[in-house]
């Protein structure tokens, strides 16, 4: 008993001693966490270089764009063929995807040989062989008459400019077919299929095996955004933000990048950690100086690395008592499968004995322990290096998402990861230490990369079909120049109807005379009050206008709110509230006393019989105060002043906000003869020749016409360009059937159009995973400011997602792109329609004056015009295209329509003293 214990103790001591000797001998292969973090940092830099246009040509890690832009979302379906070429055999699969109740994938496959004479022959021979095998497969499955979509897994480095094209950069593994490097493998395969002529195939996608792995796993777990292969070779791919990929146009969304990380170190960046054994292995390989990282990591080389170590240690008398056999000296006699067998927990030592005996050495027990430890060091180094490079990818994903902690899934395939008894456990453990702020789930690819190629094809098909349906819907919003010319022509017709006495009563565009007959001439002088009412808030202003050499306008104002109960109460209550606020303002300014002239900006449709009289036609914008419609608002204001008996006012002018805007700008720029508002609502006014204004007597001079163009189309004349979404928005509005042109343009409604399109797309499964959330059902959720923010060129998709999240909409990257597209299409149409309307106005002025060319300025106000990043540019462009004989300048109204009301009042006071203009 004691003898046995002593023997065991002696053996353990011997074993420990031998392990220490080997640790010392292979010290350079044992990498500390400090070194691994340094490698992680180096690889991160290499990735950045590969993505950069400037550094990519010389980068060793090529970071190849794959043009795979989306992982499966679970709605894919169809019948597909997958080809998988990249190893000793060639696999063809038929993959059927359906999701009637539970989504499932059924697969049938056949394996075909790729003999040495074919992989080392010509490219023509190779692709003829692939086409023959595909023909045989389709014959067996009785699908030769079907033109099924084909996904092609081609596991070699390729440069792609689209998903159905792949130009081979260089052969790897044992492939050497001539005439293929630098050629598009899809064209070569199509040529071979065409040559046979007995079947047809539609090659939709070419993918690398790593991408195939990611897509296979992505079908089961939509969090999967990394693919990893650790087998004969090694590689990884991941979903990168398009804005970081210089080699591909566009910055919206994501694209899968095939890193081709096997070449990491080919530029010398890993020389400090490569050992003499790595260098010897490289010298004897088919591609010296290439794929240096892969040669330190992958299954193709691991057994050979161990063999080289055994030979050197035996030569130095540290193993096998210095015995060296011909078998031990023969390359390929010690395989990675031997490494896996030797590292097994229980039978590892026994396996070592059998394998070493096969090599002709007669190993002692200590030799077997030593060889097991050598295998452990080599395979552990591999796991550590892969953990470092994968750690760099995870850090990059985390940084891209701007999140403190990353949760993601990595799809994995490869014999080394799957078959080696300790590899995956060691690899996961190291990764957790290197990237503690990432929670990573590893998902084993059960079906190989063929299913992945089919899934890429299925996703490409789904996206193409979705794209077709989305484009079909959005096409109704895309207006051709011909359509816009027609809108311009129709508005001209409506304008003529509104101006004529006999047709005015039937006209929808009312063309209301404003009795403003002159723009400021610079002689206006004095102190004026202005009242600006057009929404839930209103302003009272004191405007001090000074003429002379230095014309100045000094303004003081105070903003007051109108409670909802007053907006929707009685007319007396509304005007009493307004007068109460004026009283407060006069006290605030210390000017209560003298009777002051007042201009009243009243932004609702009014029929005017004089400058100081405006009969309200109808309330808009949520106002419902009773006993106002059909009454003169100036009289209602005067009556309320009398009831208060505190002060007196001289109501000189009732002005629409559009007219006020024109006058404000005309004070600065005398060529300003048009006013435009594009904000919550939209409207325009312009200086019309009196001879054309049949509703007012007199033919001399001009008068500003308040078009009230928001009602354009209320008679059905725009029904052919109104979409179903416009109709829904109109139906649920407060004034159904009214202001139809406004509802296609103004900020009050654009968000609603967008929301309804998003609901439609969500129902069809294109958005938000098909889930219509409560916020999306909420009317008014998309305010103009959100549309402006979402469409801003400066905003990355992450920020767009943040805005949508703020609105309670959890979106993916693809969702954000689609939302941005919808916003863009809706706002572009609004700008174009507004431009068509403005083109009609400027052409009318030009024709009125019989000019070959008109130079005119438009005074503009409104949040949509001011804040939206593209609206003004598109509108200006449309006006230019539709009215080429007019040069139109746009001047932003800085001081709102209140200043305009004061100026109109000043002009009115000036004209009172000029009897020639009555």
Swiss-Prot record:
Cellular location(s): Mitochondrion outer membrane; Cytoplasm, Cytosol
Enzyme class per UniProt: transferase
Domain of life the protein comes from: Eukaryota
Pfam families: Hexokinase_1, Hexokinase_2
Region feature Hexokinase small subdomain 2, mapped onto this chain: 521-655
Pathway: Carbohydrate metabolism; hexose metabolism; Carbohydrate degradation; glycolysis; D-glyceraldehyde 3-phosphate and glycerone phosphate from D-glucose: step 1/4
Residues with PTM Phosphoserine: 337
EC number(s) given by UniProt: 2.7.1.1
Binding-site residues for ATP 2, renumbered to this chain: 532-537, 680, 747-748, 784-788, 863-867
Positions of the UniProt region annotated as Hexokinase large subdomain 1: 208-447
Activity regulation remarks: Hexokinase is an allosteric enzyme inhibited by its product D-glucose 6-phosphate. Hexokinase activity is inhibited by N-acetyl-D-glucosamine.
Residues where D-glucose 1 binds: 155, 172-173, 208-209, 235, 260, 291-294
Region (Mitochondrial-binding peptide (MBP)) location: 1-10
Hexokinase domain: residues covered: 16-458, 464-906
Region (Hexokinase large subdomain 2): 656-895
GO molecular function: ATP binding; ATP hydrolysis activity; D-glucose binding; fructokinase activity; glucokinase activity; glucosamine kinase activity; hexokinase activity; identical protein binding
UniProt entry keywords in alphabetical sequence: Acetylation, Allosteric enzyme, ATP-binding, Cytoplasm, Glycolysis, Immunity, Inflammatory response, Innate immunity, Kinase, Membrane, Mitochondrion, Mitochondrion outer membrane, Nucleotide-binding, Phosphoprotein, Repeat, Transferase
Modified residues (N-acetylmethionine): 1
Membrane topology: Peripheral membrane protein
Catalytic activity: a D-hexose + ATP = a D-hexose 6-phosphate + ADP + H(+); D-fructose + ATP = D-fructose 6-phosphate + ADP + H(+); D-glucose + ATP = D-glucose 6-phosphate + ADP + H(+); D-mannose + ATP = D-mannose 6-phosphate + ADP + H(+)
Entry binding sites for D-glucose 6-phosphate 1: 84-88, 209, 232, 413-415, 449
Sequence positions that bind D-glucose 2: 620-621, 656-657, 683, 708, 742
Subunit and interaction comment: Monomer. Interacts with RABL2/RABL2A; binds preferentially to GTP-bound RABL2. Interacts with VDAC1. The HK1-VDAC1 complex interacts with ATF2. Interacts (via N-terminal spermatogenic cell-specific region) with PFKM (via C-terminus). Interacts with SMAD5.
Free-text function comment from the UniProt entry: Catalyzes the phosphorylation of various hexoses, such as D-glucose, D-glucosamine, D-fructose, D-mannose and 2-deoxy-D-glucose, to hexose 6-phosphate (D-glucose 6-phosphate, D-glucosamine 6-phosphate, D-fructose 6-phosphate, D-mannose 6-phosphate and 2-deoxy-D-glucose 6-phosphate, respectively). Mediates the initial step of glycolysis by catalyzing phosphorylation of D-glucose to D-glucose 6-phosphate. Involved in innate immunity and inflammation by acting as a pattern recognition receptor for bacterial peptidoglycan.
Protein known as: Hexokinase-1
Lineage: Eukaryota, Metazoa, Chordata, Craniata, Vertebrata
Gene: Hk1
